[in-house]
Each structure stands twice: as structure tokens, then as C-alpha cells.
């Protein structure tokens, strides 16, 4: 626990006193010894400009009894080294988020960081609270029932869904989401019919969310109410620096695009694995989530979601669910990539065409604001 005093460069530690509303914030730019702490007493009329008068023994006792140490590694959230940390949280200095009017509690420190590279030196900061707020607008004539948990949104079909044979069915979820800056959503689906596959989708800020259903059988499918379930999990996103990426184009709204470097063909009802000359060298805690692109899904190609780790070359597993050979030209987007510190796994599905992605971040918490809408 005491090793939190010596951290890497440009990481921040927030020390919170449980018995009062006073917080101590500081950046650690070098290894700090406990004996080198300032000895200036902190009085009641001062706020966050000085450190408490402690020595090594009293400081350890203070950590064990009255203090909770919380470490937020800046590289995980894409905060630049000149990131801003608020030193006061008085009401006259409140800032509003884009999604809701966030009412801060007095004395609660809030960390601001930009999400996109274009905003890193911008004047407007983005407020990230302990429980990010997500606005959910559900259309009244929706075909989906919406259930909100502490960390995700679940949608279950309440009407019949017709999936034609040898076609890709695009299903509108009839919900709109306003996701706070710095986060994204990942949609994973499951169907009770083994011949119906749900394509994984990522969303950043969508007002017209739709998913793809693929029929792998030789006849049309009729999905009964309750046969299809979609889960929307929300995770923090990260934009690596340009020197951390190899053979990847700049992102669009925090999403990178993996394009085919050479042409290839996908034979009918068969698998093919394509390798790409790309790599990244970010922090160990980061991983890249590779989601099939919409252009590929519309062709009837089923791509298995890939969890791309650092210092490795990505490989994409493609299944041609159609009865014809599909030609993939050079330059077409195969997959979309987003970087996050979330935790995932691929569940082995022997009876399915591809394995299923599962999000393991069950301890995260979000504040959902639900609103019913009359718009179709």
C-alpha cells in the first residue's frame, strides 16, 4: 500500500480523508521519499495547496487508519502529461457535461481529460465523475424491452423478428444513447437459434443504433419474442499517441480502421484467416478491441471479434456464410479498432460459427437517465 508514494511519471494519486471533506491532490514526477514530504501544517482556512505535516511513522499510521489511496494511471485514460486536475470544487466553478447537468458535491475532486486528440489542448475540458451519466431515450413503438443494470443495458425483443434466408437483417434497436466523452459502448448479442448470429457492434454517440443478424441456415428464420438478447456495456476509451502505432491511420472519433493491404477471396461456407502488418506499443493494461466493419457485414461475411494485445500482429477470422465466392479488394475496411482498459474474453461456442465476446467489467457503475420518446 505504501508503494503508492513512488509511481511512474505523470501519474496522479488522490488521497481522501474519510472523516472530512478535505482532499489532497498532487502529481508525482519523480520518486518521492516519505521523509521528503513537506512539513507545513494544513490549517482549516486553507484548501489544497499544501501537504499535511507528517513523518514516516505517522504517515504510515495515517494511511492505515484514516486515508484511502486511489491511483488513476493517466496512460489508461489518454490524459496528456499537461492534463488538468481541478483544485477546488466550489459551486461557482461548476462545469456542465454535454449529456446532463452534473451537480457536484462540495469537496469532491473531479478529474478532467479530453477524449479526442483534437481536444487535448482545447480550452474546454470534459468532466468525468465517479458515476458517468448516460442518457437513454427509448422510443415508445420500439420492438425491444429495455432493462438497465448498474453497469449495462439489456434489450430483449418483444415482437417477432424475420430473418430471410441468405440475407443480412438490419434490426433497429429504437433507442438513442448519449454517451459521455471518454467512453464507448459495445453491443454483444445472443440468439436462442443456433443458426442466427448477432454481429458485435461498438458505439460512441449514436442516435440511430442498429445491429446485424445473419441467417446461417438454408431457410428463413422466425425469431419469437425473447429469442434475441442484446447487452450494451460501457467502457473507457483511449487514443494512443502516433508514435505508439505502427501502420494504422489516424482515428475517427476514437475508432481506428483496419484496411485490407492486399486483395483476397472468401470461399462459400468456409473460413479464411487474414493477417495484417500492424502493431502498437501502448501500456500493458491496454488492449485493442477489433469489431467487424459494417461494409464487411453487409456482404454476408461473419468476422469473429478479436482481442488484440500489444506487440502482436492481428489476425482476423472470416467466415463466408453465403453460397457464393466473395472478392475483397485492397483498401476495404475489414474491422474497426478501439483501445480500452476493459476486460474481455471469448467464450468458446462449438455449436456456433464464431466464438462470442464477453465483457468482464462487472464492477463498473453508471448513472442511467431513462426517457421515453414518441419518435420512431
Curated annotation (Swiss-Prot):
It comes from the Viruses. GO terms for biological process: dUTP metabolic process. Pfam families: dUTPase. It is an enzyme of class 3 (hydrolase). Signal peptide: none annotated. Involved in nucleotide metabolism: produces dUMP, the immediate precursor of thymidine nucleotides and decreases the intracellular concentration of dUTP to avoid uracil incorporation into viral DNA. Belongs to the dUTPase family. This is Deoxyuridine 5'-triphosphate nucleotidohydrolase. It comes from Human herpesvirus 6A (strain Uganda-1102) (HHV-6 variant A). The gene is DUT.
Amino acid at each position: 500500500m505504501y508503494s503508492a508514494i513512488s509511481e511512474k511519471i505523470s501519474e496522479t494519486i488522490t488521497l481522501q480523508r474519510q472523516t472530512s471533506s478535505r482532499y489532497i491532490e498532487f502529481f508525482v514526477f519523480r520518486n518521492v521519499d516519505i521523509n521528503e514530504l513537506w512539513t507545513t501544517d494544513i490549517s482549516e482556512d486553507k484548501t489544497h495547496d499544501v501537504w499535511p505535516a507528517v513523518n514516516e511513522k505517522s504517515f504510515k499510521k495515517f494511511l492505515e487508519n484514516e486515508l484511502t489511496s486511489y491511483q488513476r494511471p493517466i496512460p489508461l485514460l489518454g490524459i496528456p502529461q499537461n492534463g488538468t486536475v481541478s483544485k477546488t470544487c466550489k459551486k461557482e466553478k461548476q462545469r456542465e457535461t454535454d449529456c446532463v447537468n452534473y451537480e457536484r458535491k462540495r469537496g469532491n475532486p473531479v478529474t478532467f481529460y479530453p477524449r479526442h486528440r483534437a481536444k487535448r489542448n482545447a480550452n474546454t475540458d470534459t468532466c468525468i465523475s465517479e458515476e458517468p451519466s448516460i442518457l437513454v431515450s427509448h422510443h415508445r413503438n420500439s420492438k425491444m424491452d429495455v432493462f438497465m443494470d448498474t453497469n449495462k443495458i439489456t434489450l430483449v425483443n418483444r415482437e417477432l423478428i424475420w430473418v430471410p434466408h441468405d440475407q443480412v437483417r438490419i434490426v433497429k434497436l429504437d433507442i438513442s444513447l448519449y454517451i459521455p466523452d471518454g467512453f464507448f459502448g459495445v453491443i454483444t448479442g445472443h440468439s436462442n437459434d443456433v443458426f442466427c448470429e448477432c454481429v458485435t457492434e461498438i458505439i460512441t454517440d449514436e442516435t440511430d443504433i442498429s445491429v446485424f443478424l445473419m441467417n446461417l441456415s438454408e431457410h428463413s428464420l422466425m425469431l419469437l419474442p425473447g429469442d434475441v438478447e442484446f447487452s450494451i456495456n460501457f467502457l473507457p476509451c483511449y487514443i494512443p499517441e502516433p508514435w505508439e502505432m505502427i501502420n494504422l491511420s489516424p482515428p475517427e472519433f476514437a475508432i481506428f480502421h483496419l484496411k485490407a493491404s492486399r486483395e483476397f477471396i472468401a470461399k462459400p461456407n468456409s473460413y479464411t484467416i487474414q493477417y495484417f502488418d500492424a502493431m502498437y506499443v501502448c501500456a500493458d493494461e491496454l488492449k485493442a478491441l477489433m469489431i467487424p466493419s459494417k461494409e464487411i457485414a453487409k456482404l454476408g461475411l461473419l468476422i469473429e471479434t478479436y482481442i488484440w494485445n500489444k506487440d502482436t500482429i492481428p489476425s482476423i477470422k472470416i467466415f463466408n456464410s453465403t453460397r457464393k465466392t466473395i472478392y475483397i479488394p485492397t483498401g476495404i475496411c475489414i474491422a474497426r479498432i478501439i483501445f480500452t482498459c476493459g476486460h474481455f474474453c471469448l467464450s468458446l461456442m462449438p455449436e456456433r460459427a464464431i466464438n462470442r465476446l464477453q465483457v468482464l467489467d462487472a464492477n463498473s457503475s453508471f448513472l442511467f437517465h431513462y426517457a421515453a420518446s414518441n419518435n420512431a
